[in-house]
Regions:
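Short, surface-exposed loop/turn microsegments at beta-strand edges and helix-strand junctions
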Residues: 55-60
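Ligand-binding pocket segment of bilobal, Venus flytrap-like solute-binding proteins
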Residues: 1-54
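Soluble non-cytosolic domains of exported or imported proteins
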Residues: 14-18, 73, 77, 89, ...
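Non-transmembrane alpha-helical segments in soluble domains
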Residues: 3-4, 21, 25, 33, ...
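Sec/Tat-exported extracytoplasmic proteins
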Residues: 6-10, 14, 28, 43-46, ...
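A bilobed periplasmic-binding-protein/Venus flytrap-type ligand-binding module shared by bacterial periplasmic
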Residues: 62-75, 94-98
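C-terminal capping/gating helix-and-loop segments adjacent to ligand/active sites or protein-protein/ligand interfaces
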Residues: 93-159
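A short alpha-helix capping/helix-coil boundary motif
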Residues: 17-20, 61, 127-129
């Protein structure tokens, strides 16, 4: 019921980052929920965009890599090379500065703060990983996800 009540307040549900970036840049939208990369892209374009800081904390997520049990053993060295490259400070600096995405290498945060003082704070991060992690609300698996997804699709369709 709450989603249906909010539907008149919505301009539309976006389907790609380009949708919201163009709508924000043109002034069609004044606020949205978006991935960090849209914020970073719009800042690079010189637009005056800002993060909101919900009193409850920002929704956050973490992700990682895994080695599948059916991986090709002949490619194991290449797999580890990729993982090592991704885990590097340089990769973390790129993820933070270009996309606004966090990274698993804490030294990347320190390097960004050293090279671009204040950027981490602007992106909603801290050099202190515990402070960053404690500031967010981590999503948890939902047992009724299919039913919620079906309901959301109905609301988007205007039902």
């Amino acid at each position: 019921a709450a989603l249906k009540e909010q539907l008149p307040l919505m301009r539309y549900y976006w389907t790609s980052p380009a949708d919201i970036e163009q709508a924000l840049a043109s002034g069609e939208l004044v606020a949205t929920s978006a991935w960090n990369s849209s914020y970073a892209a719009l800042k690079r374009e010189g637009l005056d965009v800002r993060y909101t800081s919900p009193k409850e904390g920002a929704m956050t997520w973490v992700c990682g890599f895994c080695l599948m049990s059916d991986h090709d053993p002949a490619k194991l060295d290449r797999i580890y090379d990729y993982l090592d490259a991704y885990a590097s400070v340089e990769s973390g600096v790129f993820a933070l500065t270009e996309y606004g995405y966090g990274h698993g290498n804490i030294n990347a945060f320190a390097k960004v703060e050293q090279d671009s003082p204040g950027l981490l704070k602007e992106l909603g991060y801290s050099v202190d990983v515990n402070e960053t992690l404690n500031a967010g609300i981590f999503q948890a698996p939902m047992g009724n996800e299919p039913a919620l997804q079906a309901m959301f699709e109905e609301v988007k369709a205007g039902m």
